[in-house]
Amino acid sequence: IFRDLLEAMEGRDLIAACNVMAEDPPSGPHRFEYGPGVECILIPTMTLPPSTHTNCFVLGERGGQRAIVDPAIRDEDGYKLLKDKVEEIRGDGSDIVCTIFTHRHQDHLGDMDMISQIYQAPVWASEETLAALPEIQETRKLREGDEISIDGPSGRVDWEVLETPGHCPGQICLVGEPGVVAADNCTMVGTILVPSSDGDMGAYISGLERLRDLRPHTLFAGHGPLIPNPERMLTQYIEHRKARHAKVLQAVKSGCSNLSDIAISAYSDSPGANPALAQDQALSHLNELVRTGDVRKTGERFHSENPPHQVDGSSEGSNGLV
């Protein structure tokens, strides 16, 4: 509505512009503009509650080149949303130059057969993500430091690839002047899991630190609203994960050896935490502790050679996060 008001104010004062809009109100599809040249489509997906949608981003200006990030459609509702947006993009005289996937999880990776019925464009993603897709004729393997340039009426906007593989192998972010397309690193809705199956807790924390060091003014998260001035939130995420890491280590040092007991001890400050998720996240921390040599694993049990002692940060609350 703000953009419509600015257009109505050309050659008019504010009152006259409001009168023009009252006589001829804006019509047509609503555009969720998260930033300059960054539109969002809310795609319904089977993601982790409380989230119900995945953010599909359309990069670029109207009338210029466009890139579609994470078109995660897998049902008729998502198909219609993407189809309507693509028709709108074409009506603006824009060309879709590529499809970008941030990572291979199913709530971000769309059904390529459905997508190809709507539009055709090269697929750009990391090696790990491309390997999870069916054979596609035209692809580009994205790596750390690669640049994606999108031309528009106002000029060219460059996005740089940043690898943040902790949540998922091959996950990437896109860093540009409008902000950072941050994939599944943090969110204002719920929390981010680091799956014990293929996640990497050490890499996840390092990725958060890299994002914070960029001091971005906006994060475009994979789920939920945009995150303005995200440095504080990223710091909270980092401190929370490090505190939880310390609590898992302390649980092992205190004599807990099986996963269930370790999770109960490490999440004693979060009695409402889902037991299965708490165990999975505890295992992700344990995998990292085994990798760094702080914990050894024998069969299904975990041990530490060091005597029990208080670990810095082990008493810090979780605020309900995992």
Regions found by a protein language model. Give the residues of each.
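Conserved beta-strand hairpin/beta-sheet module of binuclear metal-dependent hydrolase folds
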Residues: 29-89, 173-185
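Active-site HxH/HxHxD metal-binding segment of metal-dependent hydrolases
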Residues: 52, 73-158
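Histidine-centered divalent metal-coordination motifs
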Residues: 98-108, 167, 171, 223, ...
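Metallo-beta-lactamase
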Residues: 66-68, 73-76, 147, 154-247
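C-terminal regulatory/interaction regions
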Residues: 3-4, 8-20, 25, 250-322
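Aromatic/hydrophobic pocket-lining residues that form the small-molecule binding cavity
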Residues: 82, 204, 208, 282
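Residue-level signal for inorganic ion chemistry
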Residues: 59, 82, 223, 248, ...
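Glycine/proline-rich low-complexity segments that form flexible loops, beta-turns, and polyproline
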Residues: 10-23, 37, 132-138, 146, ...
